Each structure stands twice: as structure tokens, then as C-alpha cells.
Amino acid sequence: MDYFSIKQDYYSGNFSHVLQDIEKQNIEDDTLLFYKLKTLLALKKYELGVCSNNKLGFVFDLYYKYLQSKDISELESNIKMETATPYEINVLASAFAIDGRLDESLEACVYGIDNSELPGVTELLLLAIQVALLDGQVSIAQTMLDNFINSQEDAITSEDELLVNLAESYIKFATNQDTTSSNFYYFEELSQTFPTWKTQLGLMNLHLQQSNIEEAQGIVNVLESDYYSVEQSEAAELYKPHFLANKITLAILTGSEEVDDLKNQLEQLDPNHPLIKNNKRLNTEFDEIVAKYKV
């Protein structure tokens, strides 16, 4: 079965289309179930017991419980790496990453990539690269991508290539490579071909990386238009924290007086957002330095 359109919609943030496409299928395999349940989680529409008679569905139920309680023990005890599928390992590795156990998350991904040929290995690669970059291990992320491409040679399908290209774009963004060339064009093409909140924010990130203030402001105006803010209200709500974070960066670049107000909005909406947490950490460190050298 060809999953290309489903994966393209998922990774471009077109979640409603993902569910519509999956509903049209006459079968339900682990790949369809994985993307269906991931989409329901993203839309905050997940309900326990949706597919609990299926092992992967059961694992997602445990993952959902973990997201509510932050107690990972039940999920961790029910997944045995030796027998788990790549999709099941993906769920556990995601929980490890959220739990701050980045080394274990990466180890789980690597185990799944190296020991399975079942569907879901490329998804594990993408997650592994995201985790490695989050942990500041850029060289490991690049090595994993290179090894995967070399090992697959001509066996990479179009849907695999979709995830490989996305992984490569993350590495380039993290290392400031091809910011004005291939990586920029990648996000620009995505935003034009699949005009969603996620793709527009991705392109805005590239503009902010280059300090293209006018272009970044143009995307803010686009996302605040009726087409995005009203007709795509569900996505607008979902991506609001990311939008606010980008607006904060833009406000800092322009020297706007709105910075503090935007930070307050983001903190109220998502107090655990990385930008807010890093800002608090830096403020604490600064206060400690001041106190240390205060006469």
C-alpha cells in the first residue's frame, strides 16, 4: 500500500486530511493505526480504548496515560525491546524524550533501526535525529542519517525519502547550513505546495534565522488572516504556542516593545514551552551571577 499522501499530510500538519484519507482505506494495518493515533493525539482528540484490542493501540493508550500523569512506569514495563515493533519503540522513545531521558530515547531508536526491517524504521530514524539534535549531538544525527542512506542505497521509497528529506532539513537548520539555498527552498516549496500552519511556521523560522524581518512579518500577516486564523481555527489553536514563540523572536529582532507582553501570553498558554523555560533558566543564572559579585 502507498502511504505517501498520508505521511505528506501528517508531516505538513494537515491533520484533518490524514484522518479523512485513513477513513477511506479498507484495511487497518500498523502504519495506518500509527498515523491515525498520532494525529488524534496532536489534535487533542485521543480517547482511551480506540484500538486497545491491538498491541499498538494498547501501547498508545499507555502513552496517553503517561502524557496525563507523567508516570512512565506502566508504558516502560509493557514494551520489551526484543519483541517490540518499530512503531511501538517509537512510542516508548517519544515518552523517554518527553521525560528528559534523551540518552535512553536515542538508544531505543538505534536499537529499533538496527534490529528490525518492519515498517516504521524510517520514522524511528526521524525521531532519533530529532532527539540527537535536541541533545546537542549534531554529529551523531548526521552520522545516523548518512549511515541510513548508505545502507538503503536504492531501496529508499518515495515515502521514506519524504522523512529522510525532513530529517536532513532539521540537521541543516540546527547547523545553519544552506540557510539561503537548498534548505530555504525546501521549506518554501512545502509552504507553497502544502499551505498549512506548520509549513508557514517552518518557512518563518528560516526567515528569522536569516534576520529577514520583512518576510517574517509577512508570514505573521498571512497567519493572522481569516484563511488561517478562522478557516483553519483548529490548527491555529494547535500551533499558537509556536506562533507566539516566533513572534517573540521577531519582536526581539525589531526591538519591539511587545516582547514582554508576548512572553506573558506564551507563559500563560504553555508554561513548559522551551522558550519560556530557557528564558527562566537564563534569568536565574544571571541573578546568581549578580548576587555572587554584588558588593
What are these regions (language model features)?
Residues 1-3, 27-33, 52-61, 81-91, ...:
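Generic helix N-cap/helix-start motif at coil->alpha-helix transitions
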Residues 9, 40, 65, 96, ...:
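Residue at a conserved register position within TPR or TPR-like alpha-solenoid repeats
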Residues 1-72, 239-240, 258, 263-295:
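N-terminal alpha-helical scaffold/docking segments in eukaryotic complex subunits
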Residues 16, 86, 94-96, 101-109, ...:
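Sequence/structural signature of beta-propeller domains
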Residues 112-171, 178-182:
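Solenoidal tandem-repeat scaffolds enriched in leucines and small polar residues
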Residues 16-24, 45-55, 70-82, 102-114, ...:
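Alpha-helical repeat scaffolds
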